[in-house]
Amino acid sequence: MQNHVISLASAAERRAHIAATFSRHDIPFQFFDALMPSEELNRVMAELVPGLAKQHLLSEVEKACFMSHAVLWKQALDEGLPYVAVFEDDVLLGKDAEKFLAEDTWLEERFDKDSAFIVRLETMFAKVIVRPDKVLNYENRSFPLLESEHWGTAGYIISREAMRFFLERFAVLPAEWIKAVDWMMFTYFFDKEGMPVYQVNPALCTQELHYAKFLSKNSMLGSDLEKDREQERRHRRSLKVMFDLKRALGKFGREKKKRMERQRQAELEKAYGRRVISFK
């Protein structure tokens, strides 16, 4: 398994945290230098996600976060990797993480590496809908299908076809269709055309900040994006954004499809309820 950790080259404390965390589990990893607002960011946006530059509801830091993931996917495709595990540099790893991340036999035994899929390793401790699937458990963790929104991109495995799917569609999306990268990956706002997202349960990793909040403790690392993400969450809750979203969906003839998806999600919630994905 190739494990890539997105991190600013200057983030010495966070890189030390990652080195200690992964070494503790004997998990090999590589740092991927995160992008920041710069001419380089503008260049890769123009190349890979041109609509992102015109999306004014996202801050420049959020755009840099989005593009850090996109550029890493492009690199993985260029290298011919069948899948890659992606982490952010405030991640905590759970028990027996090495059995998932230092080897990949378990993955190839359970998933078709030539298909489009995401295995979400992270929990944000929000109540989500998951639906049981036929994928066999591994090391006391299950792989239900994620059927609701679940924010965060601190830890996931993404297949080659899923990376290709996102990059091909991101290249042609207009600005109003682009949201934060976790919105695009882990909500029904963006139509993934049936691509499955499997939620590891209990989760294999979590962000240090959110784990500290869950335990009502102070964060040791904080979050470089938290203020930007909180601002975006306020945008998400605003009536104006909801109006703009509906207008955009209608423009593209997808309002009916989105209503059907919301209805389907309501039925799934009635059948399976919502639960907090634990971390251990």
Feature annotation, model-predicted:
Residues 1-87, 91-280:
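An acidic/histidine-cluster motif and surrounding catalytic segment
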